[in-house]
Regions:
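A near-ubiquitous, low-amplitude feature marking generic local secondary-structure context
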Residues: 3, 61-68, 156, 160-163
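Anionic, Ser/Thr-rich low-complexity intrinsically disordered regions
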Residues: 8-16, 24-28, 73-76, 90-97, ...
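Short, charged/polar micro-motifs that form catalytic or ligand-binding hotspots
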Residues: 10, 22, 64-80, 102-111, ...
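Short, contiguous, well-structured surface segments enriched in hydrophobic/aromatic residues
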Residues: 34-38, 42-101
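Acidic, Ser/Thr/Gly/Pro-rich intrinsically disordered interaction regions
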Residues: 104-211
């Protein structure tokens, strides 16, 4: 019985590693983690194979092509990737736990990213009762992911005050998510992470799709 359980666990480990690594045996089955990562890269304008920033001038590109919807979708795609990784390895608060362990940024800034994720997911916008967000196309010398607002927003105050705006440096954010993906993959490969997924059937049903 113990041997069978160990074999099933090994099968799950191998299948999950393949799902993360895009090494699925069946060419008609796609990993949704890989799909959402490639889609997010495309919509943001990052290199499809590496995720490296192409250094587009985001604001100019968006205004010229009226592509706010695509740009927001790309950012949301990166948040979805964090959600997916969190759901595989954490039973509760998946995205918060992923950011807590792997982001390397302060807790307050982690909560800001969760707030932006919720804004985009629920309203497809950049404000809620806690935050007003500004998306910044950072230059190569900027290392921050989040710049906190100068003044804490009064809950429910939707007035357009400059001091209320919290800035998200988009290129640094996408680089952060790419880095988190690689760190989680490495930790899992080295048996430092255990999935909360129960079996291969659940993994395939939730995190792969057929063409």
């Amino acid at each position: 019985m113990a041997k069978i359980k160990m074999e099933k666990q090994k099968d799950l480990q191998n299948e999950l590693l393949n799902t993360i690594s895009e090494l699925l045996d069946d060419s008609n089955i796609n990993s949704v983690l890989i799909l959402v990562r490639k889609t997010a890269r495309f919509l943001i304008g990052n290199n499809l194979n590496t995720g490296e920033n192409k250094r587009l001038n985001i604001n100019e590109f968006i205004f010229e092509n009226n592509l706010y919807h695509s740009f927001f979708s790309g950012i949301m795609g990166y948040f979805t990737l964090l959600d997916q990784l969190g759901c595989i390895f954490y039973a509760k608060q998946p995205i918060r736990n992923v950011l807590k362990k792997y982001s390397g940024i302060p807790k307050k800034e982690q909560e800001v990213l969760v707030g932006l994720r919720n804004c985009l997911a629920h309203n497809y916008g950049l404000a809620n009762k806690y935050y007003n967000f500004s998306l910044v196309d950072n230059n190569e010398n900027e290392r921050r992911v989040v710049e906190l607002a100068k003044t804490k927003k009064i809950q429910g105050d939707y007035s357009n005050k400059d001091d209320y705006y919290t800035s998200i440096y988009i290129h640094n954010f996408t680089s952060l998510v790419e880095d988190i993906f690689h760190k989680i993959k490495e930790d899992f490969s080295n048996n430092k992470l255990k999935p909360v997924i129960k079996n291969v059937s659940e993994l395939r049903a939730r995190f792969t799709i057929k063409q």
